[in-house]
């Protein structure tokens, strides 16, 4: 399931990726992760690594949201490149 994650310590950071919730901490796996920097423009996240997934604890996350259709389309295009 493709979702937005907004980080608690930086609510202006929107991460998008394939979200998997796990039973134990770290409780969230975000695969094929990108950061939305402005109106649907995606940047790879994290920077400076080939790793395209991140683990987050439940205390890192402010909220989880569904992306807008236009952003979802851009994400799917970016993942398939």
Name each region found by the language model.
Residues 1-81:
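Conserved RNA-binding domains used in RNP assembly and mRNA/RNA metabolism
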